Regions:
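Domain-level recognition of nuclease-like catalytic cores that cleave nucleotide substrates
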Residues: 357-390, 400, 405-409
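Conserved lysine of the Walker
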Residues: 31
Length: 409
């Protein structure tokens, strides 16, 4: 069992703040297990709507749920979409003190229904597969190769892990997509998903993908929306502003789980991964996902110009601008692109995430940071803030702050 304290803390805060908490994420990422651990020490009623006895208990949902107190957990809520309106009525009652934790199989419609029907009453907590802040950085290569899905990461061997991921892909195509009410032949979606794996880390170009697969732009867009809506693909949005430069305005596409990326590319071990032309892109996507899990910035972007300047990850908090570059190199160096990003975006600092062992500075504003030390990256933000504040204290006084995403750690 791998502890997941960060997500348990997020759930605890969300349940205190909101009458309804929605725990969302891809299938098989551990939502039910996390909910049971969270509910273990509380007065809890648990409903699993894939269980016929539990469905029978909810034949009159308003009467049943209205009589309960404490925490009520409803798993696979998409099996009874009428419950959304019932929950809205119940939590709007002045005397309501019940808290609801709802879980559902990843679905664009699920998130849409929850957001629309329960607007102002629900808080989302997004669960990912295991990250390095949970497994320990000593297992970084295992998480990178196998991905973060619990059964894939914990498999006895790389071969068993790959077999599980292949099974996940087959089940998603043959069962999960039809259960979403979507009619797409599994071979067609498999071809698209595999092609997307080859485009991992590149900007989205529907026309190019459509030509490769002999599909219309509209069709490939709908396929992408399915994978993004089920938390399997990340569309990293571009940052652009009036800089006097032609900037990229299409999103970058990443398969969120590196293990699924490697399965789709038929990369079974590190030898084949290290010899593959998508090695650098795989590293980039893996690093980005780990950073987003650890820092959880309110918003994250990439930035690029048509002349070649870019930064892989860019975010702003309380007026400070930060950049991340991901380089699969033992000796990363300052590039013209990095200097352009520092100047154009007015970055407070830029980090280069690399596979080496030790952190070190390349300049006052650029640091090299190892993946095996990535969980300590938040301390670097604290250090920067403290030194900035000391410097500013010599001039006009400024108010001390803790950036928003640090409050989530």
């Amino acid at each position: 069992m791998i502890d997941r304290p960060m997500y348990l803390n997020q759930l605890s805060r969300a349940v205190r703040r909101s009458p309804i908490t929605a725990l969302v994420g891809p299938r098989q990422c551990g939502k039910t297990t996390l909910a049971r651990i969270f509910a273990k020490e509380k007065t809890t009623t648990f409903f699993d709507l894939e269980s016929q006895p539990d469905l029978n208990r909810l034949q009159n949902p308003q009467m049943m749920l209205g009589s309960l107190r404490g925490l009520v957990v409803i798993d696979e809520i998409q099996a009874m979409p009428e419950l959304f309106r019932v929950l809205r009525v119940l939590v709007d009652r002045p005397e309501n003190k019940t808290r609801f934790l709802i879980l559902g199989s990843a679905s664009p419609d699920l998130v849409k229904n929850v957001s629309e029907t329960l607007a102002g009453r629900v808080e989302f907590v997004e669960l990912s597969g295991f990250g390095l802040h949970e497994t320990g950085t000593g297992s970084a290569n295992v998480v990178w190769l196998r991905g973060g899905f619990p059964r894939s990461f914990l498999a006895r061997s790389d071969g068993d892990s790959l077999a599980w991921r292949e099974g996940f892909i087959q089940t998603f195509l043959a069962r999960d997509i039809p259960q979403l009410g979507i009619s797409i032949p599994p071979p067609a979606m498999r071809r698209f998903w595999t092609m997307l794996a080859h485009y991992h880390g590149q900007t989205w170009n529907a026309s190019e993908l459509g030509r490769s697969l002999d599909l219309s732009d509209k069709t490939v867009r709908s396929y992408l929306d399915i994978l993004a809506g089920t938390f399997l693909v990340r569309q990293l949005q571009p940052w652009y502003e009036n800089l006097g430069k032609r900037q990229v305005k299409a999103p970058k596409i990443y398969l969120r789980d590196s293990g699924l990326l490697h399965a789709l590319l038929n990369l079974s071990d590190f030898e084949t991964l290290h010899g593959h032309p998508r090695l650098g892109a795989s590293w980039e996507g893996f690093a980005i996902e780990q950073i987003l899990q650890i820092l959880k910035p309110p918003q994250a972007f990439f930035w690029a110009t048509h002349s070649g300047a870019e930064v892989d990850l860019f975010f702003i908090d309380h007026g400070r601008r930060y950049g991340i570059e991901c380089k699969f190199s033992e000796t990363p160096k300052i590039t013209k692109s990095m200097n352009q990003a520092l100047e154009s975006l007015n970055l407070t600092h830029l980090w280069i995430i690399y596979p080496g062992e030790h952190p070190y500075p390349l300049s006052k504003q650029i640091s090299v940071w190892p993946m095996n030390n990535i969980v300590t990256l938040p301390k670097q933000f604290r250090y920067l803030w403290s030194t900035e504040l000391k410097s500013e204290d010599r001039g006009p006084r400024v108010e001390c702050f803790i950036p928003h995403f640090m409050s989530l750690l």
